[in-house]
Amino acid sequence: VHELIEEGLKIHLPNATREERYERVLETLLEVGLEEEMAFRFPHEFSGGQRQRIAIARAIVLKPKLLILDEPTSALDVTIQGQIIKLLLDLQKKYAMTYMFISHDLRVVRALADYVAVMQHGRIVEAGPAREIFNSPRQPYTRRLFAAAL
């Protein structure tokens, strides 16, 4: 796992020493709720929720301003989904990151989004502040989608 997380550092911070990269990886593991000793285990040894935390660690180790998350809570049980959502919200506040969050799970979107774009057949049919879209959808497709999913 250490090597997976370190990969981006080697490419984007080529002048960082091995020790600096090592410390950054361990710090990032702790930030996503994993223990330092987990750095030396293999991915197949982790649960689905832990693997998702590792994926998040890989993405945030470089402290990006924008993070694109494609279905980050799919295939996780509801309890673990809640933990991952809380982690993402905490990291967003800590690092002032913007998320582009792609999901079919409207409950998760409602919990995370400030701004929503609803797509139908690959095109945006409605967009605006999340509260506005969820409370008063204007487009028939959006209304049907919310009625079916919420």
Question: Where are each of the predicted segments found?
Answer:
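Hydrophobic anchor residue at the start of the ABC signature
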Residues: 56, 84
